[in-house]
From Swiss-Prot:
Gene name in the database record: ndhB1
Physiological role: NDH shuttles electrons from NAD(P)H:plastoquinone, via FMN and iron-sulfur (Fe-S) centers, to quinones in the photosynthetic chain and possibly in a chloroplast respiratory chain. The immediate electron acceptor for the enzyme in this species is believed to be plastoquinone. Couples the redox reaction to proton translocation, and thus conserves the redox energy in a proton gradient.
Organism annotation: Oryza nivara (Indian wild rice)
Transmembrane segments: 31-51, 59-79, 99-119, 124-144, 149-169, 183-203, 229-249, 295-315, 323-343, 354-374, 395-415, 418-438
Record text on subunit structure and interactions: NDH is composed of at least 16 different subunits, 5 of which are encoded in the nucleus.
Protein name in the entry: NAD(P)H-quinone oxidoreductase subunit 2 A, chloroplastic
Family according to the record: Belongs to the complex I subunit 2 family.
GO BP annotations, alphabetical order: ATP synthesis coupled electron transport; photosynthesis, light reaction
Amino acid sequence: MIWHVQNENFILDSTRIFMKAFHLLLFQGSFIFPECILIFGLILLLMIDLTSDQKDRPWFYFISSTSLVISITALLFRWREEPIISFSGNFQTNNFNEIFQFLILLCSTLCIPLSVEYIECTEMAITEFLLFVLTATLGGMFLCGANDLITIFVAPECFSLCSYLLSGYTKRDLRSNEATMKYLLMGGASSSILVHGFSWLYGSSGGEIELQEIVNGLINTQMYNSPGISIALISITVGLGFKLSPAPFHQWTPDVYEGSPTPVVAFLSVTSKVAASASATRILDIPFYFSSNEWHLLLEILAILSMILGNLLAITQTSMKRMLAYSSIGQIGYVIIGIIVGDSNDGYASMITYMLFYISMNLGTFACIVLFGLRTGTDNIRDYAGLYTKDPFLALSLALCLLSLGGLPPLAGFFGKLYLFWCGWQAGLYFLVSIGLLTSVLSIYYYLKIVKLLMTGRNQEITPYVRNYRRSPLRSNNSIELSMTVCVIASTIPGISMNPILAIAQDTLF
């Protein structure tokens, strides 16, 4: 009898919860419409996979790409609408969040055609790969719009779990397995530290979980300058540091870059940084408003360490992917300058502008690496020697993307860094900007070293990989070359689009 009553109560409670969730989705689902499009695409992928054979493989790519493009379109139509808080405070919709969601969707849209040929050559499972990419994209989008501590914790875990699975997708590769294990262990440790910081923030604010309500709670409890807030700040900075991978939280980055499939590295190298930057900006700027001096100091230390260590260690690398791993550590140091400057002096606008250029530069470089790797099977920097003699288009594309990453004028990377450093200088961050300028010059050295190898025509320096290099038919690689061409153009011709990009970025206020 008791069991029967408890069972009825459980059914009633479950029904109420389901009806409440259905009510929220029905009346507030429009606020997360771009995310709903991706969810629909995921369901459609699963249904087609269950009911079709291998001949329908092109449909998988088409559905994934189409859902991403439609989601981008939905975001653009919603641009400049009034900020809205929905789902009982779980999500916030505003220009700042939406532009980061747009960047994540853009990354995923460019990464899918970049992966097609690689998946077919390595005989990887297509459906699962695309499901993981779309789910990670969905997690990143939810993270950008998250407005409470629970969602901010759950959304990156959704992204991270898919990232772990993607990095270990080539199960027979020992390096991939090792990289995945390191990634998983360090990711789990960082998540526990992050949630520990959230618990201190929750307790100090009197039990509040929404970001703005936490500020009000700290004022009411007079705990905004307490030791508990300092513990929360340090713990959350460490937890977010793993996602952003600045020094000294970069230990996982080189191994994961080297061991993971190259299209996966391309995807993770940009989406993780975009999502984590959006989350870090909002968490530090809103709940830790009264501790701005403290978190500015912490981020300045991370930025200096990242710019110096990342660029110095990149010089010594022999693997192209490991070199880009250390380069990305240096690049996140530049992005942190924009976070420190904040909304004053266009800090966020400069950060967003540089991230947009970084996406094109980085994905363009990885597209070239994927193409070269498929045709030669090597990742060693020395094996790129003389590539210009065999494939001028690929060599020039790689050279332009690398030089743009280094910030050589008149490429996009130069304008992005110029705007970022100028905003930092205007905000009084003279030492930080000076370090950024010096390390940028240092990065040009190792990028130019690779460009010199690409353009060499001496037979004694050309390796057997390039001597036996054979270009594949254009039809078989057109998807990779399409992504590569788009990224190269975006990395080299910023002048036409610079002013509109800056104007849009300057509108991204909270």
